[in-house]
Amino acid sequence: MQLNPSEISELLKSRIEGLGASTDVRTQGTVVSVTDGITRIHGLSDVMQGEMLEFPNNVFGLALNLERDSVGAVILGDYTGVSEGDQVKTTGRILEVPVGPELRGRVVNTLGLPIDGKGPINTKETDIIEKVAPGVIARRSVSQPLQTGIKAIDSMVPIGRGQRELIIGDRQTGKTAVAVDTIISQKGKGVTCVYVAIGQKASTINNVVRKLEEHGAMEYTIVVAASASDSAAMQYLAAYAGCTMGEYFRDRGEDALIIYDDLTKQAWAYRQVSLLLRRPPGREAYPGDVFYLHSRLLERAARVNEEYVEKFTNGAVKGKTGSLTALPIIETQAGDVSAFVPTNVISITDGQIFLETDLFNAGVRPAINAGISVSRVGGAAQTKVVKKLSGGIRTDLAQYRELAAFAQFASDLDDATRRQLERGKRVVELLKQPQYQPLQVWELAVSLYTVNNGYLDDVDVAQVLSFEKSLKDQLKAKHAALIQRIEDTKELSKDDEAELAAAVQDFKKHGAF
């Protein structure tokens, strides 16, 4: 076959054009050392802070320390397969996790991979785990209630959608129980829940998942689990991964609730990572940015306005506000709320629910100390009927605690003091509540109404809870319309109040409890 010179050049041109070669420029480095999930890498000159790094055998890491001649990175997952001399590549991406409604009902790890043995999760989107919180202009004030179903909280420390309310207390005081009851209480209310378990035993996490399944709560809940056996890096990042999953719903005009159980263990994990990366330690050996660790996480919980949602969804969702409510949990040591991490988180959040060991051991469960528990913004979000009826509860309790201390020394008490003490005992008894039994609004309203109007004053303290239960059973049987009106309107009109008063009086005369 004869080709003249001009044809040769044309043929070469067409061949070169048809190659379609693409260049993938990526910096490559070498592992210098690996210790406890921390690796030092030489040669990654243009790596970004927080960038994902690719190790051999499909292992990924996260660049955290950018030094002059090396990079300090944490390995996500099993680090035993990484050794000195391995080649590491930059990916040009920061850490992302899968997001979307497909995650509901599943248990995933920090990276969003399923660990519940129910097969793969077919999510359509991913999102970065470190995001900037919505600005002041994008936010709406907290004005919608988030019912926990717990009498003591909904009446005295109300929580609103978009609020950050800290649950703080020693170990074994019922912190997780409050959080789980709150999740169960969201059934049928259109709230997607995210439960982030950090540094807990796998058996404990399994118990929580089982309880949520038993009460039909897993269908609207995502569980992000970083157990005690996971690496410190996975434990420290789990909260951010869970927050991103919750933000997916907030940004689309829906309501979400996220529980971090608990941020003390996350701070421990971050301290461990920081010390291994040779960052200078500060107070209690925590690194200097441990406040920022929690503030940038908790500031992402917010109620965003209609304009933010409309802009985010490119006009697909209009006229809807979205919210992400956060309930971080902090474990104290011997009731010391003035330690470093507790004071940090108290200053970041919009209030705290303080659980006390002494109350818990005395049988007051949930063991909420009403004196120092506070909700800074939830009052504006409280339902009208509960707000109307719960005004006297906190005062009664505060006076009771004060008088009870004096009554130990005084033998003869005047009638007014004795009445206040008796009322206080009944309030304390009424606020007790079994686990996994969150109340509806009408049930809370009836309980508050009976104690406020003195209907419990002549009921024996030991019979207060059985009186409450029997009364509600009778109301369900004979006054279903009244219950429905209170539940629908969240108000107690004069006519409804008169009907409720007559029903309670009738029950006291003829009811058995």
Curated annotation (Swiss-Prot):
Taxonomic placement: Bacteria, Pseudomonadati, Pseudomonadota, Betaproteobacteria, Burkholderiales
GO molecular function: ADP binding; ATP binding; proton-transporting ATP synthase activity, rotational mechanism
Subcellular localization: Cell inner membrane
Family, as annotated: Belongs to the ATPase alpha/beta chains family.
Keywords: ATP synthesis, ATP-binding, Cell inner membrane, Cell membrane, CF(1), Hydrogen ion transport, Ion transport, Membrane, Nucleotide-binding, Translocase, Transport
UniProt-listed InterPro entries: ATP_synth_asu-like_sf (IPR023366), ATP_synth_asu_C (IPR000793), ATP_synth_asu_C_sf (IPR038376), ATP_synth_F1_a_nt-bd_dom (IPR033732), ATP_synth_F1_asu (IPR005294), ATPase_a/bsu_AS (IPR020003), ATPase_F1/V1/A1_a/bsu_N (IPR004100), ATPase_F1/V1/A1_a/bsu_N_sf (IPR036121)
Subunit structure: F-type ATPases have 2 components, CF(1) - the catalytic core - and CF(0) - the membrane proton channel. CF(1) has five subunits: alpha(3), beta(3), gamma(1), delta(1), epsilon(1). CF(0) has three main subunits: a(1), b(2) and c(9-12). The alpha and beta chains form an alternating ring which encloses part of the gamma chain. CF(1) is attached to CF(0) by a central stalk formed by the gamma and epsilon chains, while a peripheral stalk is formed by the delta and b chains.
Function: Produces ATP from ADP in the presence of a proton gradient across the membrane. The alpha chain is a regulatory subunit.
GO cellular component: plasma membrane; proton-transporting ATP synthase complex
Protein name per Swiss-Prot or TrEMBL: ATP synthase subunit alpha
Membrane topology: Peripheral membrane protein
S-S bonds: none
Top-level taxon of origin: Bacteria
Binding site for ATP: G169, D170, R171, Q172, T173, G174, K175, T176
